[in-house]
Amino acid sequence: MNPIHPDHLIGRGAQADVYLYDNQVIKLFHEGVSEESVLYEADIQQRIYNAGLSTPQVYGVATMEGRYAILMEHVPGPSLGELMEKDRPRAPEYLKQAAALQVQMHKIPGHGLPSQQDKLRSRIALVSVLSEDAKQNLLLLLDSLAADQVVCHGDFHPYNIIRTEKGLAIIDWVDASCGSALADACRSYLLYLLHGKEAAEAYLHFYCEQANVSKEDVLKWLPVIAGARLIEDGRGDDVELLLRLAGASPLHPTKGE
């Protein structure tokens, strides 16, 4: 039977569809996604697996129906995001679990992964809604912030954390880098903030408590992280908030401003 069948579809994303077949996950990328980027993602995820973190093992890269696919281990279980949706009263408990997992991840050296600072620099440079002065200010701030050399996920939120029989597993490592734990935590804070302040503040509290760091040290990264996020949301509903967090004014003010 063809593994790429609607009956086997378990998820859709911006870049790929995800299928489950014969107890194996097939991440089938959309047409136009390059072989280089698929091989890169597979390599990053396998490096993370080899480092001892709980994440699906990569079996290989294949071509299916003219598209590239990553074949990987199936990690069964609901995401923490799904659990939070179904049981709102337990949301703080799940946030605390996620924070503890991120703190644990940040104890692992990130050598061999792409540079977080380089990623942030390139993203800020490409943001079309920021003026050159605003970009320069963010880059100067980035240079002034201390950088660790630890594993950073880059997109650490509840839907990328799976609760399995053996514990929590982390998926979707395409944005992984070697860099600052505080910056990675700040990115998570921002992702929560874009959906509501209450969860964002709760997560920040749990992370800082378990990492033994101050909220102020995490939030020092917020202008840089928000500025870099504009490469993803530069035309979306969140652009005004992101510009404000980045300490910048719109490059092209709307009428009446």
Where are these regions (language model features)?
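An alpha-helical support segment within catalytic cores of ATP-dependent transferases
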Residues: 107-154, 164, 250-256
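Internal "kinase-insert"/substrate-recognition segments embedded within catalytic cores
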Residues: 88-117
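Short beta-strand micro-motifs within the conserved protein kinase catalytic domain, predominantly
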Residues: 57-68
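ATP-binding glycine-rich loop module of kinase domains
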Residues: 9-39
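Helix-rich C-terminal or lid/interface subdomains of diverse kinases
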Residues: 187-257
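Short pocket-lining segment of the protein kinase catalytic domain that shapes the ATP-binding cleft
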Residues: 70-78
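The N-lobe alphaC helix and its flanking beta3-alphaC-beta4 segment of protein kinase-like domains
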Residues: 35-51
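Active-site acidic catalytic loop and adjacent metal/ATP-binding pocket
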Residues: 18-20, 139-183
